[in-house]
C-alpha cells in the first residue's frame, strides 16, 4: 500500500476483490460443502453456535448430520449453477432449538455447494408478495418512468418500513442521480442529487447485476470469518458473488457511516440485461430485512424494470416510425433525381436535419460547403473536417457504414473547444471519400446545472498514511455548471445517420453503374486501347476499373488479369521518377496528364508508351475516374 497522501486512481477501488472477502455478515451462517461426498469443508465462525457443534468437529462432517431439511436433499442436475430458494431448516445437534426459526438458501456449483442460513424473524412475515400486488399492478399501468419511479419509492417504503427509499438511475458514464424519493419528513431531501461513478465502482455494479438484492443490517457489524480461508481442494477463497450474507467492503461501510446511514437494502433495476439503476433503501438505526421482505423488494424492482423497458420500447418504436417516414421521403427524392448533387442535398436539408434531430447540417462537396440550420461558419466547419480527416479517417474508412460522432467536441478535439456553442455535438458521415463529400450534423451546447452530493472531483479514495483506503466524507451540496456538451446522440439517431449514408452510396453506385455500363459498351468497340482508372483512397491505390481488348493486347495480358490491378503495376519500377511524379500529381488533383513511361509488358522487356490520362466528368465536380490511353511516343 502506498503511503502517499494524493488521491488515488479510481482503479485502486475497482481492483478490490469484493466477491472473495472471506467474511460474511454475522446475522447468518455459511457452510461450504463438497458435492462429491456431502461433507462440510468450510464454515463461518457463526456456524458452531447455531449448529451446536464445535468448529473443529464441524469441518469434515456430512451436512446431513447437522441440518434437517423438510424437502428432498439438493442435488446438481448438470454443470450449470443452481440457486434454491430459502426453505426452513432444523439443527438436530442442538440441545435446544434456536429462539427463531431459520431458513437456508442453496447455491449449487459443480465443485462446491454453498448454504447460507439466516433467521426467519416471524415479526416481519406480515409483509408478503400478496400485500405488494396492488403496487405491482399500478406500476404496470404508469404512463411514464418518472411516475412509476415515484410510485415505487412511496409504495415500497410503506411496505418495508425504511426511513428513506430512493430510485437511483445510472447515466452513460455510470454517474447516478436520484429521480424519485420517499422519506421521513424530518430527513434531508436527496431528490435530484447526483453521485459520481466512483461511488459505485465497476466490480460492485457487476455484483449488482448478478445478485439482485443485498442488505446490510447494521454497518457497524463485526464480520464472521470463513474457516479455513482457502478451500481445501480448490485452493482458492470461496466466491461469494451469489451469497446474500457476503460481507461488504470496509470502504463501503465507512462511506455509509459518513452519510449517517446504519442499514441499507438495495435492489437492482435491470432493463434488457443491463443495470439501469437501483432501488436504494436507507435506515438510520439497525434494520434486518428477512428473505420474504427481500423477495417483495425484488419483485417490485423487477416490475419497475419491466415497466421501464416497456416504456423505452414504446418511445423507441415511435421515434423509429418518425425517422422511417423521413427516410422514406428522402428515398423518394433520391429516386426522382438523376444524380446526387449539392443542389439536391440542399433542397433536402430540413429532412436531413430531422433524420437525426440535429440543430444544423453542413454539406461538403470538395472545397464547397453549404450550411443549413444552426451551424458554425464555413471556416469553423473546415476546421472540423480537417481534424476528422487527419485524426480519424482510418477508423471511418474501415467501418463501411460508420458515422463518427461526439457529444462534447472539446473532449475529443481540444483544439476545437471554442466551437462548442454551436457544435458541441456532431455526426460526421463521409459519402464519397474520393470527392471529399460528407454530411456533418451539429447540435448546440446545452449548459447544465448539476447538483452533486459532494464535490465529484474530491470523490476519489484517499490513501491515508499507515492506514487503509478511505472514502470521501463530504456529501454537502455542490453545484456544477457543465458546459461544452450537447444533447447525446441516441443509438436510433446514429443508426439513422448510418442508414442514410448507405442509402446515398447505394443510389450513387446505382447511377454510376448505369452510366458505366453504357460507357463500357461504347469503349469495348473501339479499336484503340483504352482503360478507366478509379481514384484511390488513403488505404487503396488507383486501380484499373475497365480495360478493352485492344488495351489488354498492348499490355500482353488478358482483360480479366488487368481489371482490378493497381495503375502503378503497368509501368516498370525503374521508370523516370520525374515522370511518375507528374502522373501521380495529376491523379491527386484530378487533372489530365500526358507522360511517357516504360510499359511493363508481361511477355517481354518494357516498351515506352505515352500515358494519356483524361479526367471523366463527375456530377460532384470532383474527379473520381480517368480515361487512360496508351500511345506511341511522339
Curated annotation (Swiss-Prot):
The keyword Ribosomal protein does not apply. Contains one covalently linked biliverdin IX-alpha chromophore; present in the crystal structure as a mixture of Pr and Meta-R configurations. Residues 151-305 form the GAF domain. Biliverdin IXalpha binds at residue 13. GO terms for molecular function: photoreceptor activity. Residues 13-118, 515-590 form the PAS domain. Composed of 4 domains; in the N-terminus the PAS2-GAF-PHY domains form the photosensor while the C-terminal PAS9 domain is the output module. Long linker helices serve as connectors within the GAF-PHY and PHY-PAS9 domain pairs, forming a helical spine where the dimer interface is assembled. Thus both the photosensor and PAS9 domains are required for dimerization. Forms head-to-head homodimers. This is Bacteriophytochrome. The gene is bphP.
Amino acid at each position: 500500500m502506498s503511503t502517499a497522501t494524493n488521491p488515488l486512481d479510481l482503479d485502486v477501488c475497482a481492483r478490490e476483490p469484493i466477491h472473495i472477502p472471506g467474511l460474511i455478515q454475522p446475522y447468518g451462517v455459511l457452510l461450504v460443502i463438497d458435492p462429491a461426498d456431502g461433507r462440510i469443508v468450510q464454515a463461518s465462525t457463526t456456524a458452531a453456535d447455531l449448529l451446536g457443534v464445535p468448529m473443529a468437529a464441524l469441518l469434515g462432517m456430512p451436512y446431513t448430520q447437522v441440518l434437517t431439511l423438510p424437502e428432498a436433499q439438493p442435488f446438481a442436475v448438470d454443470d450449470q449453477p443452481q440457486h434454491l430458494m430459502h426453505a426452513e431448516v432444523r439443527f438436530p445437534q442442538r440441545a435446544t432449538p434456536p429462539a427463531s426459526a431459520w431458513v437456508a438458501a442453496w447455491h449449487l456449483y459443480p465443485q462446491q455447494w454453498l448454504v447460507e442460513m439466516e433467521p426467519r424473524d416471524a415479526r416481519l412475515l406480515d409483509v408478503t408478495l400478496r400485500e405488494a400486488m396492488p403496487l405491482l399492478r399500478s406500476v404496470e399501468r404508469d404512463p411514464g418512468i418518472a411516475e412509476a419511479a415515484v410510485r415505487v419509492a412511496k409504495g415500497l417504503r410503506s411496505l418495508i418500513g425504511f426511513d428513506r427509499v430512493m430510485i437511483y438511475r445510472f447515466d452513460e458514464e455510470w454517474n447516478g442521480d436520484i429521480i424519485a424519493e420517499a422519506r421521513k419528513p424530518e430527513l434531508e431531501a436527496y431528490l435530484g442529487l447526483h453521485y459520481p461513478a466512483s461511488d459505485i465502482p465497476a466490480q460492485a455494479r457487476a455484483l449488482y447485476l448478478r445478485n439482485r438484492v443485498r442488505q446490510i443490517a447494521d454497518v457497524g457489524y463485526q464480520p464472521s470469518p470463513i474457516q479455513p480461508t482457502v478451500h481445501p481442494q480448490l485452493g482458492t477463497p470461496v466466491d461469494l458473488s451469489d451469497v446474500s450474507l457476503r460481507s461488504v467492503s470496509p470502504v463501503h461501510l465507512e462511506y455509509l457511516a459518513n452519510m449517517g446511514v446504519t442499514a441499507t437494502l438495495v435492489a437492482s433495476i435491470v432493463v434488457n440485461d443491463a443495470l439501469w439503476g437501483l432501488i436504494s433503501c436507507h435506515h438510520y438505526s439497525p434494520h434486518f430485512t428477512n428473505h420474504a421482505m427481500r423477495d417483495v423488494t425484488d419483485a417490485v424492482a423487477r416490475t419497475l424494470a419491466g415497466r421501464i423497458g416497456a416504456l423505452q420500447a414504446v418511445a423507441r418504436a415511435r421515434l423509429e416510425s418518425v425517422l422511417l417516414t423521413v427516410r422514406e421521403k428522402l428515398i423518394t427524392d433520391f429516386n426522382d433525381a438523376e444524380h446526387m448533387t449539392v443542389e439536391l442535398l440542399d433542397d433536402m436539408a430540413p429532412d436531413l436535419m430531422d433524420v437525426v434531430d440535429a440543430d444544423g447540417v453542413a454539406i461538403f462537396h470538395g472545397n464547397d460547403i453549404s450550411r443549413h440550420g444552426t451551424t458554425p461558419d464555413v471556416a469553423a466547419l473546415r476546421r472540423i473536417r480537417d481534424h476528422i480527416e487527419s485524426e480519424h479517417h482510418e477508423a471511418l474508412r474501415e467501418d463501411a457504414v460508420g458515422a463518427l460522432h461526439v457529444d462534447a467536441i472539446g473532449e475529443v478535439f481540444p483544439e476545437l473547444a471554442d466551437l462548442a456553442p454551436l457544435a458541441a455535438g456532431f455526426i460526421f458521415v463521409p459519402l464519397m471519400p474520393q470527392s471529399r463529400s460528407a454530411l456533418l450534423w451539429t447540435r448546440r451546447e446545452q449548459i447544465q446545472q448539476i447538483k452533486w452530493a459532494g464535490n465529484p472531483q474530491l470523490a476519489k479514495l484517499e490513501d491515508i498514511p499507515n492506514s487503509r483506503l478511505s472514502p470521501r466524507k463530504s456529501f454537502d451540496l455542490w453545484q456544477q455548471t457543465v458546459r461544452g456538451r450537447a444533447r447525446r446522440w441516441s443509438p436510433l439517431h446514429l443508426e439513422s445517420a448510418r442508414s442514410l449514408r448507405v442509402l446515398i452510396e447505394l443510389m450513387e453506385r446505382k447511377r454510376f453503374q448505369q452510366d458505366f455500363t453504357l460507357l463500357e459498351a461504347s469503349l469495348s468497340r473501339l479499336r484503340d486501347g483504352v482503360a478507366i482508372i478509379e481514384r484511390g483512397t488513403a488505404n487503396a491505390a488507383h486501380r484499373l476499373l475497365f480495360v478493352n481488348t485492344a488495351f489488354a493486347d498492348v499490355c500482353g495480358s488478358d482483360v480479366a488479369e488487368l481489371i482490378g490491378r493497381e495503375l502503378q503495376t503497368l509501368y516498370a519500377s525503374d521508370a523516370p521518377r520525374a515522370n511518375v511524379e507528374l502522373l501521380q500529381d495529376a491523379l491527386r488533383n484530378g487533372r489530365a496528364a500526358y507522360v511517357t513511361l516504360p510499359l511493363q509488358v508481361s511477355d517481354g522487356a518494357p516498351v515506352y508508351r505515352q500515358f494519356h490520362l483524361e479526367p471523366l466528368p463527375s456530377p460532384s465536380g470532383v474527379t473520381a475516374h480517368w480515361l487512360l490511353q496508351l500511345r506511341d511516343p511522339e
